[in-house]
Amino acid sequence: MKPVILAILLVLIPFLISESFARTLPALTRVQVQGNRFVTTDGKRMVFRGLNASDPDKLDKSGHWEKDYLAEMKRWGANLVRFPVHPSAWRERGADAYLALLDQGVAWAGQLGLYVIIDWHSIGNLKTEMYQDPMYHTTRQETYAFWRTVAARYKDNPTVAFFELFNEPTTMSGKLGDCTWPEWKAINEEMIGIIRSTGAETIPLVAGFNWAYDLTDVATQPVAAEGVAYVSHPYPMKREKPWEDKWTADWGFVANKYPVVLTEIGFCGPDDKGAHVPVVSDESYGDAITAYADTHGISYVVWVFDPQWAPMLFSDWNYTPTRQGRYFKKALSKYAGR
C-alpha cells in the first residue's frame, strides 16, 4: 500500500468508527410521549427502571468504560441508563473525543436493550451562570451548543430516548442569584427549540428548582412544548416522613398529566461511605419511593453505579452490592423482562 494512502486511512479510520457508532440503528423502538405515558411507536407502554452511570469521562480514565459495565446494569434488571456529562469534562476532553465516548456507550446500550438518557450534569443557576462547584460551570451559549450538537448526532438513533436539559437547577436560596420559574421555563423552551430545529424527536426532560426536586410551578405554567416529560430528584431528606402526600404536592401531581422520570433516587445509612445530605435514610425510603412510582406509573433511575460516587450501588469492581445496591438490585429484578 502506498504511504500516502496508508496515511489517509490512518486519519479516517477513527472518524469512521466513531460515526458508525452514532449511525448504527439498534433494534430498540423509538419512545414518544402519549398523554402522561411513554409509549413506543408500535404502541407498547414503557415505564423505565434504570441506573445512573458515573460520568463516561471518569469511567474511561479509570479503565471501566466498557460494554460489560452496561451489561452488569442489564443483569441487575435495568432497562434505562443515564449518562451524566459534566460540563468541565466536556471541555477538558474536547467535544469530538467526548462524543466518541458517547457513541460507544449508546452503541453498547442499544446492543444490550438499554435506552439512554444523555444528561447535561450541571448544578446551579444557568440564568446567572453561577454554580455550586467549578465542575458544573457552563454558559448558556455552551449549553445551547451542546444540545444542538448532541441532538443532531443522535436524532436518528432511538436508543437515545431522552435529553435531560439541565441536571439540578438551584439558586441556593439566592447565593447563586435569582431565577424565576417563567425565566427558567423560557430557557428550557429555548433549548427545546434548538433541539427540535435539528429534526430530533428525542424527549426533553425538564427539571424544576431546589436541586431538581420541586415541580409545583408546572401546575399553572407548564413548558410550552409538545412531547416533553418532567424530572424530580426526590432524595429522602428533601422531606420528612411520611413522604407520600408531600411528594404528591411537590411533584407527583404532574404525573396525572405528563410523564415523570425520577432521574436520581437513592439512599445510604448515616455511617455508610459517602453519606451526605440529602441521601441519608434506610430501606423504608426504598419501599416508599418504589411503591409510589409503581402506583403512579412513574419511571425512576437509581444513583449511582459506581464504587466512589455516593450513594454508591456497589463497593468494588466485582460489582459487590452495597446496602442500597442490595435493595435496588432486588427491586429492579422484579421488572426484568417486562
Q: Which stretches of residues belong to each language-model region?
A:
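Positively charged n-region of N-terminal signal peptides that target proteins for export
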Residues: M1-V4
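Bacterial N-terminal signal peptides
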Residues: A7-F15
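Sec/Tat signal peptide C-region and signal peptidase I cleavage site
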Residues: I17-F21
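N-terminal carbohydrate-binding accessory modules
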Residues: A22-L80, F209
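Extracellular glycoside hydrolase catalytic/binding regions
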Residues: R30-V31, S62, M135, Q141-F162, ...
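Feature marks short, surface-exposed loop/turn motifs that line or immediately flank catalytic pockets
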Residues: D55-D57, P87-R91, G124-L126, P169, ...
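Aromatic-lined substrate-binding rim segments of carbohydrate-active enzymes
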Residues: W65-N125, I187, M191-T198, D282-H296
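Aromatic- and acidic-residue-enriched carbohydrate-binding clefts of CAZyme catalytic domains
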Residues: Y98, T128-H137
